[in-house]
């Protein structure tokens, strides 16, 4: 467990109690935020793997991944700007990786988001493509990154 200013950072599965915090992070972090209803649908989506980072009683980050047959796609990563560069996104991804259900994980990132790019490279993501004009406000390409997980072969 990680400590930030005398509080333990907990990585937990997204639950109804986290909706207010998730909605707040969406508003803080994104030009086109998901609405509360979008977050609520993730609670019952069998393919959704949403994790929240909770510090004290405050949701300070979350990671959303859609998983189908071992193939993961990151839908959202958000960390409260006040708590960035403290290892929260790394902890969220670490918990996601530790679940062990992924063959690979793909995400998109703005080329201008240098901090996120540096983190993703450190976590083992490799560039695999580019989506032209993917983002708006401002218009920008998305870099497509993938991390492949090695699975142990069964004996036999």
Q: What kind of region is each of these model predictions?
A:
Residues 79-81, 85-98, 114-122:
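Conserved acetyl-CoA-binding loop-helix of GNAT-fold acetyltransferases
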Residues 52, 58-66, 71-78:
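Conserved beta-strand in the GNAT
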Residues 7-21:
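A short beta-loop-alpha structural element at the N-terminal edge
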Residues 14, 77-79, 109:
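Hydrophobic adenine-recognition pocket in adenosine-nucleotide-binding enzymes
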Residues 3-6, 106, 110-114, 123, ...:
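C-terminal "cap" of GNAT-fold acetyltransferases
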Residues 32-41:
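A short, aromatic/hydrophobic, helix- or strand-capping loop or linear motif
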Residues 25-27, 43, 92-103:
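Alpha-helix C-terminal capping segments
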Residues 50-54, 108:
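Cytosolic beta-strand hydrophobic patch enriched in CBS
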């Amino acid at each position: 467990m990680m400590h930030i200013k005398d509080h333990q950072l907990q990585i937990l599965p997204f639950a109804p109690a986290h909706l207010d915090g998730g909605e707040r992070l969406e508003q803080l972090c994104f030009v086109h935020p998901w609405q509360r209803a979008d977050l609520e649908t993730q609670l019952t989506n069998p393919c959704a793997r949403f994790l929240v980072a909770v510090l004290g009683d405050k949701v300070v980050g979350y990671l959303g991944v859609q998983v189908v047959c071992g193939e993961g796609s990151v839908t959202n990563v958000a960390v409260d700007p006040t708590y960035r560069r403290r290892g929260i996104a790394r902890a969220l991804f670490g918990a996601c990786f530790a679940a062990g259900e992924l063959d690979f994980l793909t995400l998109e990132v703005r080329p201008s988001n240098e901090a996120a790019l540096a983190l993703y490279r450190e976590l083992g993501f490799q560039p695999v493509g580019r989506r032209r004009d993917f983002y708006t406000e401002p218009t920008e390409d998305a870099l497509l990154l993938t991390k492949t997980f090695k699975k142990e072969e069964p004996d036999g």
